[in-house]
Amino acid sequence: MLTVRYIEKLWDARKYSRLLEELIAPRVEAAAAGELADTPAAAAAALALVRLDELHQPQASLCPRLIRTLVALQESDGGWGDVATTALCLRALCLQNGQGQAIERGLAYLATLQQPAGIWPKIPIRRMPEDALVSAFVLAQLADSERFRDAVRFDAALARFESHRWSLDQGAQSLWDHARLRIPAMIATPAAAESSWS
C-alpha cells in the first residue's frame, strides 16, 4: 500500500514513471496504463491526488504542489497531451469540489475532440479513428461529474458503449463496467425511467 510519505518521496525524487506505475498497478485504470506513459509527470500528479483523496488526505502538504504542477503542465489547447491524461487530470482537479479555468479549458478540450458517434480518438486529433479503450477510460474518470456530462455529448457516449458493449476488448470492457458504476442512477437507466410506475 502506498502511503502519503512514500508518494511524496517518489514525487520529490522526480521518479514520475515509477510513481505512476505503483499508483496504477492495483487499479482498474491499469488497463489503460500505456495511454498515460507519454505524460508521466501529469499522470502521476493526477493519480497521486486521486489516491490521496481516497486515503482521506486532501490536506497533505503534497497536494497543493501536485495541483500547481497540473495547472503548469496544461497545454494551450486545454489538454494535458492526450485524451486519457486530460481525463485523469480533470478528475484530480475536480476533487474536493475543485473549480477554475484549468478545469473549464480541459472540459472544452474533451468536448472538442469528442466524435459525432460520442466517443474519443486515441490521438488528440478529432479526425482520427475512435478508440474504445481511451473513451472508456474518459468515462471511468469523469462519468460522475455533472460538469463533464454537461460539457460533452454524454448521452451519445452512453449509447455508443451500450450498443457496442459486446465488441469491446477486455481492457475497454473493464473500464466501461467501472464507468457504468460511476454514472448516477437516473442517467444510467433511461429504460427503467420510461417503464417506471406511474
Give residue ranges: language-model regions.
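Preference for long, amphipathic alpha-helical scaffolds in soluble/luminal domains
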Residues: 1-198
